[in-house]
Amino acid sequence: MKVFEADSLLFEADKRTKEYKELRSQMVKLKKAFKEVANLDDSEFSGKGADNIKAFYHGHVGVTDQWIDLIDMKIAFLSSMSATLEDAKMSDAYIEESFLEHELANAYAKSKSIMSEQKKAMKDILNNINDILPLEIFSTEDFKDKLSSADDKREKTIDKLNKLDEDLKTEYAETEPNEQFIQQDFKKLQESTGKGKNATPIHYNAKAYRESDIHKKKGDIEKHSEAYLSVKKEEAKEREIKELKKKLNDGVSDPDEYLEIAKKVGYENLEPTQVQLAVQIEQAKQLEGAGEITWDIVKGVGVGLYDVGKDTVTGIWDFITDPGETLSALGNAAMHPVKTYDAISAAIEESYQKDMVNGDAYSRSRWVTYAIGSVAVAVVGTKGAGAINKADAAGKVINKASQAGKKIKDVKIPDLLPYNPKYKLALADNVPYNVVDSQNLKNELLTNAKKIPDGTRKPFTGQKKSPPWLNKEKYDAYEIEGKVKAKGKVKDVSRRVYTMKDIDINQKTEFGVTNLQLMKNGNAPYAKDGTQINLHHLIQEEPGPMLEIPNSLHTKYSDVIHQLKSDGESFRNDKVLKAQYESFRKRYWKWRAKQFENEN
């Protein structure tokens, strides 16, 4: 049984890496010494015996090269181990396979048994008092779901452990061909010096060594080493780029540092906003170098560009669409959109007075650059609470941490710099101050901040459930969450929907439209019997639990499945509820389309 301890494994890997590096250093020195003998001038060492000896040491140079390649492969493998564990999310894990396969498995079975016995005992008790006080037995559905989830996690951990173990052993075995070749090639080198008492370097037969079957494999071994080291080098480069990009996303406000990292990552590996930001900072530095603006302004522009660039990809959208949820992290009560706007506008006004009216060259350049970027991308469209944050409204309205890691890859920041000709220059004593009409910018920020969405544009989300009684061969269950606007009112349309598992997304209508295309447009797909799928209200309530069902069955059993409500009681008689359901249905099928795309 395996015992996996990440700390010990990484400690030993680091220790062994250092040992291999020391061995490599010694091999390089040894190779140098061999080459010095092999390259002795004829004036120093000549004759047939001397030539044989020099050729013999030249052969040792080749063997030493093979050793260095092998050591490099070992170092590359050991150095990448921490990243391998991190990718497997096991960089700090301690796992005993026997515990997972025996103790936990037994505990799972025992827990199920105990719950079953307790439920049976409770049922007997309730039956005894049923004539006095009829009571329903408690549900074990939630318990079973959580127990099943825990057992699933146990099994996945075992699989992950075995996969990691197999992957590491497989990669470690990559050096075995090199090791075998070195041993056999070195043996052949020794044998080429003769036999018995005549086995000395002076009798070395270079031709016999070069033409031996084992030595002819040298080229293949070198290609193998080169290919492996090339892959490991590329992996290391990708990890470095990933770490540097994370650093850019986390926050680098110094222009010099931002440019240095951007160039190291390579513009081709940056997000569009990061490329734009790097280019703009370079332009600002060029102007500073030409003496057109001061370094304080350059630094302010750089920070402002970083501010707006980061906000563009983290977004005011999330904050505005659900201010209550976002602000609750700060201990605030849920806020009405009007109050949200009041908070934003107050923050904008305060930052304007602080950084523009009473600021210096640095703060003014930063504020204007930020403001232009905010207006250019229409604050609420792709920016967010982080945007207000960067205009020094930060702590007042946004929990920055809740926005981390979100990206909008297709955002392109326009020309944000304050000296761009398309913006008006504000003049002081008839001298261009290198800023735009900031008062007008402030007004535009306030105008955009009024466009507060209400949460109805956010895509639906669905969380899978596993009720024990569900026929899992035919259906899945999802808790759908979302909001729609019906007759001017924002309505929460969250509900459970039981989804058919045999929908063929490639099935076509008579007009050649696939089910996936239908769903993308918000329309119901077709079942395999050729009838369109109906969303049936199980308890005839809107909103309420629903079932996907072929229209053929919906029609066939209509009298049975609609007995809960009379025609006069149908929610469809309520204009708001009817509009609410129609909006839900369209948005729901779009969610299903996205779900199918993610699965494939």
From Swiss-Prot:
InterPro entries xref list: Bact_secretion_toxin, LHH, LXG_dom
Assigned keywords, A-Z: Coiled coil, Hydrolase, Nuclease, Secreted, Toxin
Nuclease in keyword set: yes
Classification via PROSITE patterns: LXG
UniProt keyword Hydrolase present: yes
GO-annotated cellular components: extracellular region
Record domain LXG: where: 1-235
Disruption phenotype: Deletion of the yobL-yobK operon has no visible growth phenotype, however it is out-competed by wild-type cells.
An MF annotation (GO) of this entry: toxin activity
Gene induction: Expressed on rich and minimal solid media likely in early stationary phase; not dependent on DegSU. Not expressed in liquid LB, but only under conditions that promote biofilm formation.
Compartments reported by the entry: Secreted
Coiled coil: 12-40, 141-176
Disulfide bond entries: none
Biological role: Toxic component of one of 6 LXG toxin-immunity modules in this strain. They promote kin selection, mediate competition in biofilms, and drive spatial segregation of different strains, indicating that LXG toxins may help avoid warfare between strains in biofilms. Mediates intercellular competition during biofilm formation; disruption of the operon disadvantages the bacteria, but overexpression of the cognate immunity protein restores growth in competition with wild-type.
Family stated for the protein in its record: In the N-terminal section; belongs to the LXG family.
Record's subunit section: Interacts with cognate immunity protein YobK but not with non-cognate putative immunity protein YezG. The interaction inhibits the toxic activity of YobL.
UniProt name for this protein: Toxin YobL
Originating species: Bacillus subtilis (strain 168)
The gene coding this protein: yobL
